[in-house]
Curated annotation (Swiss-Prot):
One Gene Ontology term, aspect cellular component: nucleus
Protein name, UniProt field: Protein sds23
Localization in the cell: Cytoplasm; Nucleus
Domain CBS residues, every copy: 108-173, 199-258, 276-333, 336-394
Annotated source species: Aspergillus niger (strain ATCC MYA-4892 / CBS 513.88 / FGSC A1513)
Length: 508
């Protein structure tokens, strides 16, 4: 995603020269100038065949680079794209070791832990989450406690923002706690994490001892668990670290040569490995942002693909992006389009991180596992969208793939239906008048193809587990459990004064 500076061959007379152009040297000469040139010719007969400066400028020799033969053939370039070399920063501590003997305790550090107390206000917790850059905060009873009683991440923040905006209708058994939140908001009492940590769908807190092997982690993560809390063998109440799917995939990629059973999978295509899911959730770019937030909260997913009218992927919205919505001044964004919010995300990345590139969150069925994992690690994404680069409605060139043969993941030829989301009451006119960014104007609109599936970290680790002879749990069953354990049902019906009270000033 980086651009190399182009080398150019510049003429020394291209700027700052007092020489006349070829046209002015012939058409605008004065008679005296003609005489002088004739006199010079008569005194220098040996120079009559020498090229003039004008002739020299007309016939500037081409750059030697233009005649240079490519050092790599197209096939070699394609092979390099499909099978990117693993990073050279493999940890020498794991070279030559049987990966079944490597413990997860070797891969975590207490320095990575970020704790908050259960009575910490949600505003303070949100600031810590954003300022530290941690993907998750561990919740403990008090600073003296070494055990975790829960977690707080961007999915929880998303659930709270929906509640604060009055866009979540709680289940019957949660009405009392919902009213308590309203009372605290009206009285200006800080709302502690204790009251909001379980608002959204989340998996049970899973722990593993530090002595557990990497294979145990592969089997656990391959069954749909996204992160585990690593605890001491001597005291299972003492937290030593936190280990995630992403960290494990990154570790296996960087040290793949030490694990032949996994390394042999990388050159194979997603289609041949039968990896990925056809059950993909997307949202049209012209839908309100609040619809995307509700879908992620209801489905328990960390990101959602944004598509255009032809189902080409034009962008990606994740729960991490809700950090851009934590002030009341961000309220209009909820009613603006998903496409507009993507432009806000890109603008924020450029201002804060100095990045003007567009991260590519998609692959295609012919992409190799190596190409896919390298992209996952580079974008730090939990999911990549699988697109059909050869569809008639594609808006740009295909993502490089191992084969030019189109092997779709889906069998139906009709476009998949857009997620059904109740729009509820009409948005205020102020929101409707906000400028809208067309999907075709986004960088992603020129890169992708038609959305046909999704491949996640769970899919990759489930494949690794099965290739290693393990029997991981069915990820689909894990997703079903999260849905059944949902603490709220999504609705866009506003909750009157409660939403306005919670939305006064800063949301959190």
């Amino acid at each position: 995603m980086t651009d190399r500076p182009m080398e150019t061959v510049a003429d020394s007379n291209s700027s700052g020269s007092n020489l006349a152009s070829p046209r002015s040297s012939t058409d605008s000469r004065t008679p005296s100038a003609s005489v002088r040139s004739l006199r010079l010719s008569s005194h220098a007969p040996n120079h009559q065949h020498r090229q003039s400066i004008s002739d020299t400028l007309r016939a500037t020799p081409g750059s030697p680079r233009a005649r240079r033969q490519p050092s790599l053939t197209q096939a070699a370039i394609q092979s390099l794209i499909d099978n990117p070399p693993a990073p050279n920063n493999a940890n020498p501590a794991f070279v030559g070791r049987d990966w079944r003997e490597i413990s997860i305790g070797e891969l975590v550090s207490p320095d990575d832990l970020k704790f908050v107390e259960i009575n910490t206000g949600i505003e303070e917790a949100t600031n810590i989450l954003i300022d530290t850059g941690a993907p998750v905060l561990l919740i403990r009873e008090s600073p003296q406690h070494k055990s975790a009683v829960g977690t707080f991440d961007y999915a929880d923040l998303n659930a709270y923002l929906l509640l604060a905006a009055g866009l979540t209708q709680p289940n019957e058994e949660l009405l009392a706690s919902y009213e308590e939140l309203a009372r605290k908001a009206k009285e200006g009492i800080p709302i502690p994490l204790r009251d909001v940590k379980d608002l959204g769908r989340k998996e049970p807190l899973t722990t593993l001892p530090a002595s557990a092997s990497v294979m145990t982690a592969v089997q656990t993560f391959g069954g749909g668990v996204h992160r585990v809390v690593v605890v001491s063998e001597r005291d299972d109440n003492e937290v030593l670290g936190i280990f995630s799917q992403f960290r494990l995939v990154k570790f296996l990629w960087e040290n793949g040569r030490s694990f032949p059973v996994i390394d042999q999978l990388y050159p194979q295509s997603l289609h041949d490995l039968r990896i990925g899911s056809r059950d993909v959730i997307s949202i049209n770019g012209d839908r309100p942002l609040v619809d995307a937030l509700q879908i992620m909260n209801e489905e328990g997913i960390s990101s959602i693909a944004v598509v255009d009218s032809h189902f080409n992927v034009v962008g990606n919205i994740s729960t991490t992006d809700v950090k851009l919505l934590t002030r009341s001044s961000s309220l209009p964004l909820l009613r603006n389009t998903c496409t507009h919010f993507i432009s806000v995300i890109l603008s924020n990345r450029g201002l804060e991180e100095g990045k003007d590139s567009f991260p590519v969150f998609h692959v295609n069925p012919g992409s190799t596992l190596a190409h896919t994992v390298a992209k996952v690690v580079a974008t730090r994404s939990h999911r990549l969208w699988v697109t059909d680069p050869l569809s008639p409605s594609s808006s740009g060139p295909p993502t490089p793939s191992h084969s030019s043969v189109h092997i779709p993941l889906v069998t139906n030829s009709s476009p998949p239906p857009s997620p059904a989301v109740n729009n509820g009451t009409a948005a205020p006119a102020a929101y409707l008048s906000a400028p809208s960014i067309p999907a075709s104007a986004l960088p992603g609109a020129r890169l992708s193809g038609r959305l046909v599936g999704v491949v996640s970290l769970t899919d990759i680790l489930n494949l690794h587990a099965r290739a290693s002879g393990l029997s991981p749990a069915d990820p689909a069953e894990s997703r079903s459990r999260r849905r059944r354990s949902s603490s709220s049902s999504v609705g866009v019906r506003r909750s009157g004064e409660i939403g306005r009270e919670l939305f006064s000033g800063r949301i959190v």
